[in-house]
């Protein structure tokens, strides 16, 4: 270390290397003393030479520390370098302070070992000569330690000061300065994007978009960026991100950092005012950049929010002015000149549509005024247009009310015929009538074409000839349907007699043609007739039915089913009867039938009282006891009691 005066101190590389080596040897020697368990020469490294080296290092450091922490020798020019050096060697210096406080503990352990050696009974003449100098080194080192402790307190204060200075200057201020500079760059980037096309131009929008955008505003929120395109949406997101970064910077820079600088100035070291002044100057530089960032952010906010909202509503005021002029012209046209009904209706519709647009636009502007989105100039212009609209509106309302009343009267007098559809649900008779009319029209056209020009009293138009040629070219034929399709179909008949009735049966009451008795007999299928005669008679009956109009009556499905049941009920049964003669003879010859009583079968339900009879083996049923045996005389029954 070279001293160049009372106010300057230079820490050279040689001094740093020598000083750090001594601190390291002091630490290693204390560690060896604490780990030593015996002073035997063969097992320990503790010797007089080691203790003498420890004493020399401790004495040298004790001579340097006072000059290092002397309040008078801390120069203003070198104070930052000294703070950096303390910060660089902080771990070694804190370790040295801890070692000095532990010297007494290490020496006490060494004295215990020496006492153990002298308490032994062995006759070692060199023991006193070997251990006696150690007592002198311990005593002298203890004295140096006592002299060094006050300077170590000052050294610890300097180390704490350097740590706090580094935290405020580098960790807090430098980091905050970097964040501010990055936000300034981000703000300038957003300004460049805002000036790009088409964002710098007047935004194009609809009233629905404007209403939706105003719906996102509330009385507590700040105005938002008017965005009507994807590019404006991206720009709005970037602006919001920049806006979120500013409050933490402002809180840290205006509230936290000044208090830390003031608290740092309360430390009791030499030239602390110099260090505080350095921090204050650095703080002023950061505040300068912070003010520039705020000014750029406010300009960006004015460009993106305030000016764009003003331009937007200035354009709305221009549109309102043009629309009000058009409404006045429409009113003068409708009041001074009479036009045809079609033109009058068109003009009234234009007046109604423009009146609604004006009212809706004023409602939007007044809602924007509630959120303070307009400046005083735009608001005053809007108020002038609103007063003009109040003067025009009564006349427009009077015209529209009169038009609405006349339209209602015309609508009530006009009869709207019911459209006739040719599609699904139309009776076949109507379709047949239309087809017949079409056929007659085609026949008339063909008759006209066969006439000569002399016989024809009228000259055929060119369009009719062209239509006739197209019909012949396309080969269009009229749609015809059989007469059977004219029968009533209850599923598609709009005038069905079953309409309005509650039908509970699964089969709807469908009408069918009744048949006579001959057809009924044929349908029953008598066994005497052959298949050929059956087909012939059926054909004849069908001819008779079609020729007789009185047989075309309707009969429901239920009546037909009833007749079918009555018919089959009158016929004899065709189920074969099986006659078991062997069983019958056995029953007649057996004087008494043996009845086997078997236990009842299992009841299906707990409450059932029905027992099912069964045989013992459940393979076949026994024949019943003849009635003659059951009604035989008492004596006969006693003799012929069946065995169970």
From Swiss-Prot:
GO terms for cellular component: cell cortex; cytoplasm; cytoplasmic microtubule; kinetochore; mating projection tip; nucleus; spindle pole body. It comes from the Eukaryota. InterPro entries: Karyogamy_KAR9 (IPR013889). Pfam families: KAR9. Residues 506-534, 606-644 are annotated as: Disordered. GO terms for biological process: establishment of spindle localization; karyogamy; mitotic spindle orientation checkpoint signaling; nuclear migration along microtubule. This is Karyogamy protein KAR9. It comes from Saccharomyces cerevisiae (strain ATCC 204508 / S288c). The gene is KAR9.
